[in-house]
Amino acid sequence: MITDPISDMLTRIRNAIKVKADKVDIPASRMKIEISKILKEEGFIKSYKIIKDKKQGIIRINLKYTSEGDSVISNLQRISKPGRRVYVSKDEIPHVMGGLGVAILTTSQGVMTDKECRHKGVGGEVICYIW
């Protein structure tokens, strides 16, 4: 049984990148779909597709690589975990890798990047960092 589905998603992506896989399948949930949407908007993945099955559905993420064959994603780091939640106010939103990376937060207005949170003036729970 998976106790932290978001960590499982990030680990599956990390493992797929290590073996230079073109795509990775992840069990779907609303939160994971929102995270996939942000990864696509920020240019970390080529695309994602939701595949219906008899259970919860599957998200198929097509990974993105440079012309040299290196992954666009250098690293993914889970911040807020079930055993230790991490919340930040609008003034404490972190800059990942000096602005080169992205922090994904879940707020009262939905899942968004650190840049969107600063623009809208909202804080929330820091889900992960991606760079």
UniProtKB/Swiss-Prot annotation:
One of its GO terms (cellular component) is cytosolic small ribosomal subunit. InterPro entries: Ribosomal_uS8, Ribosomal_uS8_sf. One of the primary rRNA binding proteins, it binds directly to 16S rRNA central domain where it helps coordinate assembly of the platform of the 30S subunit. GO terms for biological process: translation. Belongs to the universal ribosomal protein uS8 family. Disulfide bonds: none annotated. It comes from Thermodesulfovibrio yellowstonii (strain ATCC 51303 / DSM 11347 / YP87). The keyword Ribonucleoprotein applies. Pfam families: Ribosomal_S8. This is Small ribosomal subunit protein uS8. PANTHER family: 40S RIBOSOMAL PROTEIN S15A. Part of the 30S ribosomal subunit. Contacts proteins S5 and S12. One of its GO terms (molecular function) is rRNA binding. The keyword Ribonucleoprotein applies. The lineage of its organism: Bacteria, Pseudomonadati, Nitrospirota, Thermodesulfovibrionia, Thermodesulfovibrionales. Keywords: Ribonucleoprotein, Ribosomal protein, RNA-binding, rRNA-binding.
